[in-house]
Amino acid sequence: LTNIFILRQGFRQELIRKKLLKSQLQPFLDEIEVEIEADTLVEKLSSFERLVVELLRAVVADYRLIVMREIGTLVNEGELEKIHAFMKHYAKQGFSFLYISPHFEEILQICGRAVVMSNGKVIKALAGEQMQAQTLNFYSEEYNAKVRHHIESLKERQSNKIVFEGRHLCGDVIFNFNLKVAQGECVVIQSLEEGIFRDLYLLFQGEKQDEIHPGTCYLEGRTTKICGDRGIAFIREEPTETMLFYDMSYMDNLCIAMDHRVKNIWGNRKMKWCIRADFEEILGENVFDKRMQELTEMEKYDLVYTRIMLQKPKIVFCVQPFKGADLRHRIHIWELQEKLLRKGIAVVILAVNMADALSLADRLVRIDKGTVVTEYQRKDFGMLPRNIPWKALYDENGRI
């Protein structure tokens, strides 16, 4: 209620009359058939409800141009379809929308025109009959080719060795969740409910593990605590902002997860020199002498993922790894994750929307209402909803 009415420009009431404001809000909610308690704190709203609040705030303020930026990374495909329906509803009332997304599948669902941009420049403007998947996919052909090659190469490196197992994991929302992950396997876990995502995030990061669940985790057959086990790595959401230490050197950032492998790594100049010699060709000769603030986004991603490779974990948990990345950076992140898989490291991706994660997945687990709803093997990906990215690479039998 506060966000929609009181914080908007032009609100002039000196006394806040909540009852009156609630009565003014209800017609807007009824119009789009959404139920949200007006007194609910924003921090307790789901991502979908927050998007609705943002949209209603713009509508109530009569902002005629509304920018929707990468909303597909915040909600699942069912909720995304509802948001699209709201946008179409308000578009008929004269509101205009600027929809920013890295995924052509989303653009085709909602937009009447599209502009393809790269390095701040317009490459192509599309409208009418040009708004087809074949036309738009032309601009991501490099990405598509890499995905196809990855899918084909999977046949050569299948493994049945289980490296991680979680039994009877529970949280505030999750109940009795079981998970097995094989060596070099990529598993995508899609949470269809806000609380599930929060539970899984805390579980995989190892925060408050004893409080979150009474279940047991096993790494290569031995019981383990996720937090502090160097055989398990965790890549946070937007890692270039959340996993780098800008008051430390590039080399110290790179070696920070090697303390279990090399004694006194911080004072071992010879080892650091060897690491530099080994990785200069891969990372670049100049990055080791740069200040952290001088690194490009690509160089930051290289640093994060190379640090993980030096840690040599058996499994890596990633939270929405492609969030906020444009096509160029998505390709690079995809390549880095594919490199982990080729080294036999298992990758578990936690996502709200499958998006690019499906292009790497061997298996998809969808969770709703605290338990597994559906599990798809790669051969079943052709049965996924038609608007899912990369679904076009599979027919109904899961073949390329």
Task: Tell where the protein language model's regions lie, with residue ranges.
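Switch/coupling loops of ABC transporter nucleotide-binding domains
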Residues: 95, 230, 344-345
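Flexible loop/N-cap segments at domain edges
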Residues: 161-296, 306
